[in-house]
Swiss-Prot record:
This is TATA-box-binding protein. Sequence repeats lie at residues 14-90, 105-181. Belongs to the TBP family. It holds the Pfam family TBP. InterPro entries: TBP, TBP_archaea, TBP_CS, TBP_dom_sf. The keyword Transcription regulation applies. One of its GO terms (biological process) is DNA-templated transcription initiation. HAMAP family: TATA_bind_prot_arch (MF_00408). General factor that plays a role in the activation of archaeal genes transcribed by RNA polymerase. Binds specifically to the TATA box promoter element which lies close to the position of transcription initiation. GO terms for molecular function: DNA binding; DNA-binding transcription factor activity; general transcription initiation factor activity. Keywords: DNA-binding, Repeat, Transcription, Transcription regulation. It comes from Saccharolobus solfataricus (strain ATCC 35092 / DSM 1617 / JCM 11322 / P2) (Sulfolobus solfataricus). The keyword DNA-binding applies. Signal peptide: none annotated.
Length: 198
């Protein structure tokens, strides 16, 4: 079976989305700490207030400037839902919110499994923009320009993708690296017995 016949059947999972949320106002973190349950605020340790949601399982770091860093969402939809719940909770406890929050995704971290074995030595030799030092780290680090992401590629065909700003960039990057690795003859099918061990 030639590598051109290796089928593309990845599994891609979004693991974490980190976003900034901007409110066009300053916030009184002391008042929020006093009125909203289950909030952590210790300005001697950290300048932001820590607000954890259980559903979806997201953490927000809220700063007095009105900026928030929201982390833990597994999709853009879940991120928006979490921000709406945070704003609703703030309003419920008497915190006046002016205008709509501005949400900007800073980083999407995803994992993928190509279901092929990857010859990393060959890939390191043939791919540009990569770093591979197996004595230091077992994965090949590949910097992709379009979309602008970093992929950690392992010989098992598993990978971690960081730096995406949109979910579709993750799928695009995984497809693009698979096609490039197949074109360079760096992938081979996993044998039936190997797949059963997973």
């Amino acid at each position: 079976m030639s590598n051109s016949a290796v089928s593309y059947k990845p599994i891609v999972n979004i693991e974490n989305i980190v976003a900034t949320v901007t409110l066009e106002q300053s916030l009184d973190l002391y008042a929020m700490e006093r009125s909203i349950p289950n909030i952590e605020y210790d300005p001697d340790q950290f300048p932001g207030l820590i607000f954890r949601l259980e559903q979806p399982k997201v953490t927000a770091l809220i700063f007095k400037s009105g900026k928030m860093v929201v982390t833990g969402a597994k999709s853009t939809e879940e991120l928006i839902k979490a921000v709406k719940r945070i704003i609703k909770t703030l309003k419920k406890y008497g915190i006046k919110i002016v205008g709509k929050p501005k949400i900007q995704i800073q980083n999407i971290v995803a994992s993928a499994n190509l279901h092929v074995n990857v010859n990393l030595d060959k890939a390191a030799f043939l791919l540009e923009n990569n770093m591979y030092e197996p004595e230091q780290f077992p994965g090949l680090i590949f910097r992709m320009d379009d979309p602008r992401v970093v992929l950690l590629i392992f010989s098992s065909g598993k990978m971690v993708i960081t730096g995406a700003k949109r979910e579709d960039e993750v799928s695009k990057a995984v497809k693009r690296i698979f096609d490039k690795l197949a074109e360079l003859d760096c992938v081979k099918p996993i044998e039936e017995e190997e797949e059963l061990e997973l």
